[in-house]
Regions:
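Well-ordered mid-protein domain cores that form the structural environment of catalytic cofactors
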Residues: 87-95, 103, 111-118, 130-170
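Extended, low-charge, aliphatic-rich alpha-helical segments
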Residues: 2-112, 165-431
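Short, solvent-exposed secondary-structure capping/transition elements
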Residues: 116, 122-125, 150-153, 206-207, ...
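Hydrophobic alpha-helical segments, principally membrane-spanning helices and signal/leader peptides
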Residues: 120, 125, 143, 150-151, ...
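Amphipathic hydrophobic-ligand
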Residues: 124-140, 318-329
Length: 431
């Protein structure tokens, strides 16, 4: 008698819900940035900002001033090729403002700038190079955090105020000795123009930052046939001590962006501040992964045993009536690199059915067959997939260190510190 081929679809979770369209109201992933994380982020951010401003420099600026001490009615000047050589803001702080954004405050900043200059007046015209030292820089502003239509975080600088208290310029060139003797009176108009132009320049830089953020992928390919959506569901939630990001955290089959047939449920992260970052991974996130693997056929196994076929023929209720509360498993969790690694192990397998049938030789044989299939077929297949890991959400060029995992009701909690690595090339917002 030819064996009958029976396709058994097995996943990490039993998902027998009807397929329906759904709209996600709650996050699959919650990320909390604490004050400790903000403090470190500011330290790392200043390194990044220094690299950016050194690379991009400052836009040219020009103007016209009268030099009464030389009895010159006007001098037109143009400063170009402005490059920042050193950059120091030793006293800078980030403070969350509930429901609004993050307050940035800095004082005692200083910088060394090199530039080319050109001056024109009714009496003379000249050009050369100059070094400009700026000190006693005070800055304050409110960074408003929001969400773009594509689910990216956005930042907008509001209430910008900047004051440069001291400037010293040193000219170079053929007549540098002459110009340097008149440098002090020229520093006042330089300060005046800088204090007028710096806030617009900084605001433009925020536009550049938003453009870079919007280019990062919030839907990333996971394997060959699965997508993972880390987009923001809503603007960041800001309290006096932390910033919460609610991320979608949903898996999809490539080419099919239909939401899973189940909804995430709300969960609350514990009130802690010892770590820089807390990541809550909901049960929905894991169910979404299992469901998507299920749809892609990742856990498909074909059975051809005569004994299995015979048993199903004699029991028209089929496998569905037996396949509930039958397996006892352990789940191992670890964080390697930027990924959550899971592994499954089978402790015990027992068919659930009428107790009078438990002593049946055929039932025991069927139970042993399925136990072997799970132990040697399904679980190794699932673990091979799970060993690829789930990428955890983390900021650009930031690694997770000193990480710990706890199991809570309805979610996993990852507590971690951060380490900035400017050489690490990362292409995704989420992982």
């Amino acid at each position: 008698m030819e064996s009958e081929k029976i396709l058994v679809l097995c996943g990490c979770f039993l998902l027998w819900n009807p397929l329906i369209q759904s709209t996600q109201l709650y996050p699959g992933i919650k990320v909390r940035i604490t004050q400790k994380g903000l403090d470190y982020g500011m330290q790392a951010g200043m390194e990044a900002i220094e690299l950016i401003v050194k690379k991009n420099g400052i836009p040219d600026f020009k103007g016209s001033e009268s030099l009464e001490f030389l009895k010159v009615d006007y001098v037109d000047y143009n400063f170009s090729n402005i490059k920042i050589n050193t950059f120091s803001f030793p006293n800078i702080s980030l403070t969350p403002v509930s429901g609004t954004g993050v307050k940035v405050l800095s004082n005692h900043g200083s910088t060394n700038v090199s530039m080319a200059w050109e001056v024109t007046s009714p009496l003379f015209r000249d050009e050369g190079g100059a070094a400009l030292f700026l000190a006693e820089i005070f800055f304050s502003g409110l960074v408003n955090l929001s969400r773009s239509d594509t689910g990216h975080p956005t930042m907008k600088l509001e209430d910008c105020y900047i004051r440069v208290g001291h400037a010293h310029i040193s000219f170079s060139g053929e007549f540098s000795v002459l110009y340097n003797s008149f440098a002090e009176p020229m520093e006042k108009p330089i300060l005046k123009n800088l204090n007028k132009k710096l806030c617009p320049i900084i605001m433009d830089r925020f536009e550049d930052i938003n453009a870079n953020i919007s280019s990062l992928e919030v839907v990333t390919k996971f394997g060959e046939d699965i997508l993972l959506d880390y987009s923001l569901l809503e603007p960041p939630e800001i309290t006096q001590s932390s910033i919460d990001l609610n991320l979608k955290g949903t898996f999809y089959q490539v080419g099919n962006l239909t939401d899973p047939p189940f909804q995430p449920v709300p969960f609350t992260l514990p009130d802690r501040s010892d770590s820089m970052l807390y990541i809550g991974i909901s049960e929905y996130f894991l169910r979404s992964a299992a469901f998507t693997y299920f749809l892609t056929g990742a856990f498909n196994i074909t059975l051809t045993t005569k004994e299995l076929s015979k048993h199903l023929i004699q029991n028209p209720q089929g496998i569905g009536s037996l396949f509930s509360q039958v397996a006892s498993t352990d789940v191992g969790l670890a964080i390697l690199g930027q990924k959550l690694i899971c592994s499954l192990s089978l402790n015990r397998f027992r068919l659930s059915g009428p107790e009078s049938n438990r002593s049946s030789i055929e039932v025991l044989r069927f139970e042993n067959i399925l136990s072997s299939i799970l132990h040697f077929g399904v679980f190794p297949l699932a673990n091979a997939r799970l060993q690829q890991g789930f990428p955890l959400p983390n900021p650009h060029q930031i690694s997770l260190v000193k990480s710990d995992i706890e199991v809570h009701k309805g979610f996993l909690l990852v507590s971690t510190d951060l380490r900035y690595d400017p050489l690490w090339k990362k292409q995704h917002f989420g992982g």
